C-alpha cells in the first residue's frame, strides 16, 4: 500500500511580535492535526528556529537580492511610522522565489498568510500553484470597520476631525469617531491602500482564519461573512488549543523570574494591577511620569512592564522621578518583560492595564481578568470600545486623560468599587471561551471544518 504523503502548509507571518505569535500558535494547531508546517519569514526580526523544532523555517530575502536589506532591526522600534514600515515590507518581501526558498518535502495544501500582506500573496500562491488562506490577528469588529473605510471617507468621518471625536459612527455602532482604527502616519493615503489591499486580499482568498470565537463576536462575524463571501473560521482562542508548542520563554535571567514569582506569591488574591502596553506602543515622557505617580498614589500592588525604548527619548527608567523606586518599596515591581500568559493566570492579578492589542485582549478574557483600557493606535481603539461598552469587562482610561489623579481614580475603581461587577462579567466571558473549545464548542467545530476545507484543496507539490 502506498504510504500517504504528509500534507504541508506554508505560513507567512508579518514580522512583528503581535502578528508572529498568533501565526505560530495557528501553526501548532495545524501541526497537532497532522500537517507539516513551513514558516516563511523575512530576514530581519527572524525568530529562533530552535524554539520550534517541529516546524521548518525558511528565510525570505528581499527581491533586490545583493543590495543592503531595506529594513533593519532599528526600523521596527517603538514610535516608527508603521504605515511606512508595512509598505516597505509589502514592496520588498511578497514576491519571493518560493520554489527555491522552501524546496521539496511533502504535498502543499495551501499558503496561510497574514492578511496585511494583501493581494500580493496571490502572486506567491500562483508561483507554487496552491490556494491561499489569510489569518487575521485582530478581531472581527475591527475588520468590519476596515471594510467600511471607503464609506467612512465618503461620509466625512475620515480623516478624523478633532471636533467630531465623540460623535457616534451610526454605520458602525457602538464606535465613536475617536474609536476608528487609524494609525498616525505621514502617509494617510498609504494606510488606505494597505487596508483596501487587505480587504480585497481576503475576498480573493479561499477563507479567513480568525483568532476569535463565535460567542464573543457573533454579529461582527455575520457582517464579515456577508461582506467577504468566503468561508470564515473563528477557531480562537488560538493559545488555548492543545498543541505540542513549547512553553513561552522565561526571562533570560532565571533569578529575575524567581524573584518576580516570589513577589506575586506573597500578594493577596486579585490585589495586583498588571500594566503592559504591548510590543510596539510608545508613550511620551510626561505620560510615563504620570503613570508612575498614579500607580504609586493608588497604594495598590502593581507589576509594570516597561520595554526598553517604550518611552520616547529614553532608554528605560531614567525618566522616573528621583527616588521613585526607593519610594515604592515593596508596593510594586517594574520589569522589562514577563510571560504574560502566566502573569494573567496568577491568582494575585486583579486587573490588567492594557493597550488593548487583540492578543492581550483575548488572553485577558480567557483568564477572567478585568481591563483598564488605554488604546494607542489602530484596532486597539475598537477593542477598547467593545471591552468597555459591549462585553463590559473593563473601564476606559484615555491617553488624553493620562493624569495621576485620573489614573489613581480609575485603577482604584476597577480594583475596588466596580471590581465585583466587572469580575462577574469577566468570569461569564471566560466560561464562554472555555465552552467554545469543548468537544461540541463552536471553535472546535470550526477547526474540524477548517481542516476538512484545507484537505479539500487540489494538492500540488512545488514546481520543479
From Swiss-Prot:
Its EC number is 2.4.1.-. Belongs to the UDP-glycosyltransferase family. The lineage of its organism: Eukaryota, Viridiplantae, Streptophyta, Embryophyta, Tracheophyta. GO terms for molecular function: UDP-glycosyltransferase activity. It comes from Arabidopsis thaliana (Mouse-ear cress). InterPro entries: UDP_glucos_trans (IPR002213). UDP-alpha-D-glucose binds at residues 279, 338-340, 355-363, 377-380. It comes from the Eukaryota. This is UDP-glycosyltransferase 76F2. It is an enzyme of class 2 (transferase). Keywords: Glycosyltransferase, Transferase.
Amino acid at each position: 500500500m502506498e504510504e500517504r504523503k504528509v500534507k504541508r502548509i506554508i505560513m507567512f507571518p508579518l514580522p512583528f511580535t503581535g502578528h508572529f505569535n498568533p501565526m505560530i500558535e495557528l501553526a501548532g494547531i495545524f501541526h497537532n492535526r497532522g500537517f507539516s508546517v513551513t514558516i516563511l519569514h523575512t530576514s530581519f526580526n527572524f525568530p529562533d528556529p530552535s524554539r520550534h523544532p517541529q516546524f521548518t523555517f525558511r528565510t525570505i530575502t528581499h527581491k533586490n537580492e545583493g543590495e543592503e536589506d531595506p529594513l533593519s532591526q532599528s526600523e521596527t522600534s517603538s514610535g516608527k511610522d508603521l504605515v511606512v514600515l508595512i509598505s516597505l515590507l509589502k514592496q520588498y518581501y511578497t514576491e519571493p522565489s518560493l520554489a527555491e526558498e522552501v524546496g521539496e518535502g511533502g504535498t502543499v495544501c495551501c499558503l496561510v498568510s497574514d492578511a496585511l500582506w494583501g493581494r500580493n500573496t496571490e502572486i506567491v500562491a500562483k508561483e507554487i500553484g496552491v490556494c491561499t488562506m489569510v489569518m487575521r490577528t485582530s478581531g472581527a469588529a475591527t475588520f468590519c470597520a476596515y471594510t467600511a473605510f471607503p464609506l467612512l471617507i465618503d461620509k466625512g468621518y475620515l480623516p478624523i476631525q478633532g471636533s467630531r471625536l465623540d460623535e457616534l459612527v451610526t454605520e458602525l455602532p457602538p464606535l465613536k469617531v475617536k474609536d476608528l482604527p487609524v494609525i498616525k502616519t505621514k502617509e494617510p493615503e498609504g494606510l488606505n491602500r494597505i487596508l483596501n489591499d487587505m480587504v480585497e486580499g481576503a475576498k480573493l482568498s479561499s477563507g479567513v482564519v480568525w483568532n476569535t470565537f463565535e460567542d464573543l463576536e457573533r454579529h461582527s462575524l455575520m457582517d464579515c461573512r456577508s461582506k467577504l463571501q468566503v468561508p470564515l473560521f473563528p477557531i480562537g482562542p488560538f493559545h488555548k488549543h492543545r498543541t505540542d508548542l513549547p512553553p513561552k520563554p522565561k526571562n533570560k535571567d532565571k533569578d529575575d523570574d524567581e524573584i518576580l514569582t516570589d513577589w506575586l506569591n506573597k500578594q493577596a488574591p486579585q490585589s495586583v494591577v498588571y500594566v503592559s502596553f504591548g510590543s510596539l506602543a510608545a508613550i511620551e515622557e510626561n505620560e510615563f511620569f504620570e503613570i508612575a505617580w498614579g500607580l504609586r498614589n493608588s497604594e495598590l500592588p502593581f507589576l509594570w512592564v516597561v520595554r526598553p525604548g517604550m518611552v520616547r527619548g529614553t532608554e528605560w527608567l531614567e525618566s522616573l522621578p528621583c527616588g521613585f523606586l526607593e519610594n515604592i518599596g515593596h508596593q510594586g515591581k517594574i520589569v522589562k518583560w514577563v510571560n504574560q500568559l502566566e502573569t494573567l493566570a496568577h491568582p494575585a492579578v486583579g486587573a490588567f492595564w492594557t493597550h488593548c492589542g487583540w492578543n492581550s485582549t483575548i488572553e485577558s478574557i480567557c483568564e477572567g481578568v478585568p481591563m483598564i483600557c488605554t488604546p494607542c493606535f489602530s484596532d486597539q481603539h475598537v477593542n477598547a470600545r467593545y471591552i468597555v461598552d459591549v462585553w463590559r469587562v473593563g473601564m476606559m482610561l484615555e491617553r488624553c486623560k493620562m493624569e495621576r489623579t485620573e489614573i489613581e481614580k480609575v485603577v482604584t475603581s476597577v480594583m475596588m468599587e466596580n471590581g465585583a461587577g466587572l469580575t462577574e462579567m469577566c468570569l461569564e466571558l471566560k466560561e464562554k471561551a472555555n465552552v467554545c473549545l469543548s468537544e461540541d464548542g463552536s471553535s472546535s467545530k470550526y477547526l474540524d471544518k477548517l481542516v476538512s476545507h484545507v484537505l479539500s484543496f487540489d494538492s500540488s507539490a512545488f514546481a520543479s
